[in-house]
UniProtKB/Swiss-Prot annotation:
This is Arginine biosynthesis bifunctional protein ArgJ, chloroplastic. Its main location: plastid. Pathway: Amino-acid biosynthesis; L-arginine biosynthesis; L-ornithine and N-acetyl-L-glutamate from L-glutamate and N(2)-acetyl-L-ornithine (cyclic): step 1/1; Amino-acid biosynthesis; L-arginine biosynthesis; N(2)-acetyl-L-ornithine from L-glutamate: step 1/4. It comes from Physcomitrium patens. Belongs to the ArgJ family.
Length: 520
């Protein structure tokens, strides 16, 4: 028998590619292993799979395996002289059963990261399940997050004129009511550019959830992601709702299932929760998000849900969420495309108790804003890091601007620069491309004040290039790509108080390949 020594899984929703390298070791079963994410480009490395069907165990050393999609089952073709086909259920080969969870890097602050995602905050339950909405495998594709009481609601949405039906519905619903009870999320069909029929599908799906949750239809919000122009598979979704509602729980596993269910081309799921104190009251905030491609400021192609148990008024919570989004999701970019479906919804249950936060200028509001910023920035960075084909996260920090908005504009410009992103992938410490993107951002500044650092390498001072260790700088970029780490670009444009950050990723050959093969 041949034993799998390593397994490379490119876990794109509609394009799962399986390649197994075999050793000559004799084994009837594979050692138990917790599959971990290690440095990769568009691939996830799984050193040893916990379970593998017997059909694969019979393959001989040296066989290369190629994946062919056959509905919900993956046909794996062994590249032998006989070109044998064997069928493998997706659940049997995916690390972490479906896709791994992304590590979330939080900014430093008076909070502690805890398990739980959207169910960490008091009063929330979640579920995620496979409802036959997507073609590839049995990866969950339908999620539901509910609050046991009326939760103060907030939302931000795409600025794309071709807004999807769920975006239009949520905007109207949030305008009509300051509270909500449930958020339904489907993956597989964007329900964008689907006209009146698509909007009616949204209403019927919302009605089904409201009925089985025992809440008013106006208390249910909805998000959709997937292929533009395709309506929700309404019948399959509605049929799945009773089981979905019945599986709701406050467990970490339920939160994780919901985080996976909302993904599309993501290689990793994004989920985070923190615990902190606000005005002496212990509170929790959690969130999930999806996004990998079509990511550009003014939201990025992303869906997100935030839950918290702070007691806060809508007049404070809603502008607070907008501020946090402007400092996070509106500051990430992968490919310059802004989606039709971008949505972030945020619910506050008030279940933690403590005094109600009703003054946005209060110290308690400042503390809540900082915690919310941390959660959303952590999720945003994980989305940028998971950019299609990306080998590293790029973090751009701008200081010395006239105000935060000016700094944010410059940071976005550099993070979005295709030439800068390509140079980083090529491990080229090209200060000229960074300076160019800084200059065309549309923010006036004195070029003689321009300073640029790449990591610890000082590239420019007073608008002039400096001599630096180009080999060392190139090695810095190479190492970041090898370990899927972070490339830091620090830019100073003057002496003002404004500062901001933006996040992106490098631009690889694989980005073009992935999007040439994937129908948007």
């Amino acid at each position: 028998m041949a034993m799998v020594s390593s397994c490379r899984l490119c876990l794109r929703t509609d394009s799962l590619y399986l390649a197994i390298e075999q050793s000559a070791a004799q084994a009837n079963s594979l050692p138990r292993s917790s599959c971990s994410v290690v440095p990769r480009r568009t691939q996830i490395i799984c050193p040893q799979l916990q379970v593998l069907p017997n059909a694969l165990k019979s393959l001989q050393p040296g066989h290369g395996l190629k994946r062919l999609k056959e509905g919900n089952v993956f046909a794996v073709r062994a590249s032998t002289t006989t070109d044998t086909d064997v069928n493998v259920d997706a659940d049997a080969v995916a690390p972490g059963k479906f896709i791994p969870a992304s590590p979330i890097v939080l900014s430093k602050g008076p909070w502690e990261q805890i398990p739980g995602g959207v169910t960490a905050a008091k009063g929330f339950r979640a579920a995620g399940m496979y409802a036959q909405l997507r073609a590839a495998g049995k990866k969950p594709d339908l999620a539901l997050i509910v609050c046991d009481t009326d939760a103060v609601s907030a939302g931000t949405f795409t600025k794309n004129v071709v807004a999807a039906a769920p975006v239009i519905y949520c905007k109207k619903t949030l305008a009509d009511s300051s509270t909500a009870r449930a958020i339904l999320i489907n993956a597989g069909q964007a329900n964008a550019a689907t006209g009146d029929a698509g909007y009616q599908d949204t209403l019927e799906c919302v009605a089904a959830v409201a009925k089985h949750c025992g809440v008013p239809e106006g208390a249910v919000l909805i998000e959709s992601t997937g292929v533009i122009g395709r309506r929700i598979k309404k019948d399959a979704l509605i049929e799945a709702v009773p089981k979905l509602v019945g599986s709701l729980s406050a467990s970490v596993a339920s939160a994780d299932a919901a985080a996976v269910a909302i993904t599309t081309t993501d290689l990793v799921s994004k989920s985070v929760a923190i615990e902190t104190k606000i005005g002496g009251t212990t509170v929790r905030l959690g969130g999930i998000a999806k996004g990998s491609g079509m990511i550009h400021p003014n939201m990025a192609t992303m869906l997100g849900v935030v839950t918290c148990d702070v007691d806060v008024t809508a007049e404070v919570w809603r502008p607070m969420v907008i501020t946090a989004v402007n400092r996070s999701f509106n500051q990430i970019t992968v490919d310059g495309d802004s989606s039709t479906n971008d949505t972030l919804l945020a619910l506050a249950s008030g279940a933690a108790g403590g005094p109600k936060i009703s003054d946005i200028n209060s110290e308690e509001a400042r503390q809540l804003q900082a915690a919310l910023d941390a959660v959303l920035q952590g999720l945003a960075k994980s989305i940028a890091s998971d950019g299609e084909g990306a080998t590293c996260l790029v973090e751009v920090t701008v200081t010395g601007a006239s105000d935060e908005a000016a700094a944010a504009t410059v940071a976005r410009s550099v993070a979005a620069s295709s030439l800068t992103k390509a140079a980083i992938y090529g491990r080229d410490p090209n200060w000229g491309r960074i300076a160019c993107a800084t200059g065309y951002a549309g923010v006036p500044f004195d070029p003689l004040c321009l300073q640029i650092y790449l990591g610890d390498f000082h590239l420019m001072e007073k608008g002039q290039p400096l001599e630096f260790d180009s080999n060392g700088a190139s090695a810095y970029l190479k190492k970041a790509g090898e370990v899927h780490g972070t490339v830091s670009i620090n830019i100073c444009i003057g002496h003002g108080p404004g500062q901001s950050q933006a996040w992106g990723c490098d631009l690889s050959y694989d980005y073009v390949k992935i999007n040439a093969e994937y129908t948007t």
